[in-house]
Amino acid sequence: MTNKFILKRCTVDAWDRNCLETSLTSLKGVLTDTALDPEILRKLLEFQAEDGSFLLTDSWNMPADARVDYGYVPTYLGAAILMRAYLAPEPQLPREQIADALVRALRLSCKRRLAGHGYEAEEGTLFALRVFKLGGLRDFLEKDPAICPEFQAVVWSLIDEREAQLKSEGTIQGAWQEDYTDAWHELLEEIRPGRRRYLAYGSNMCAEQMRYRCPQAAKIGVTYLKDWSLRLYGVATIEPNPGDKTPAVIWEISRDDEKSLDRFEGYPECYTKQNFIVTVQGTRFSVMAYVMTERNKQRLRNTTPSEHYLEAIRRGYEENGLGEGRPTKRSIPSQP
């Protein structure tokens, strides 16, 4: 494969489509090849641009569609190759070297949220996720949550958004009403990890309640969600509030645990899922939190939380040594 691996950067002013397509074919071949050649990995690292991309031209100054096809697509492919190399039990190059290049490529990859161009945005997202699936995306999300949490938050958001759409509408269509429902069902099954990290800010901070709702959950630690406030509309939610912070407990939960939480939270009608990046003991990673929908807020606007519910939250604060931000009547929004 080494002799057939060709990566060249064309000039925007002297467009050579054959050269561009040859480079794309080389990247696709490496990603699907049985074994990763260390010499190819070295060439790939040498080719990586300063911005972390694997841009196939000498500039991003080109039409939007071309930026996707010859800027982002090769970066997805290059990043997926590096992901596969990083996850290998015995990496061909120093793991730290691979990780550094991988993080830079992933940061560039998530700038468009993995969307395709124009009317093909949905097809482009499916393509990008399929590329990363070949790189080991499922294992990467589950086993290495601290590697480029920005990218992981984007992928989890896409998973959550499409699962919510399938659950509420039963179908996913493109700009021209192309039906992507089956494609998403299949892909989500292939890339969704068995475990994820969940941020609890209300009664689910309480260990006793979590043992009942999520018997496979494991506590990761405690943190503060910056620029968000705890609010109570009969039950808890969080709302953006610059300068404030909300105490939270981070749990690692199984897929069955998450399905249980979905039922308790009334997802996706009463709560949506939102992904945040938090820091626990100096490590940054992506987490999911349930955030109340505006429709549910209106429905509950005249509802006050029960003392039993407040006590469950307070118990969670006490168990986790979180003295600040204990829920009080000030957490209840004023009524219009």
Region spans (language model):
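Preference for long, amphipathic alpha-helical scaffolds in soluble/luminal domains
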Residues: 1-193
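Glycine-aromatic micro-motifs
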Residues: 192-336
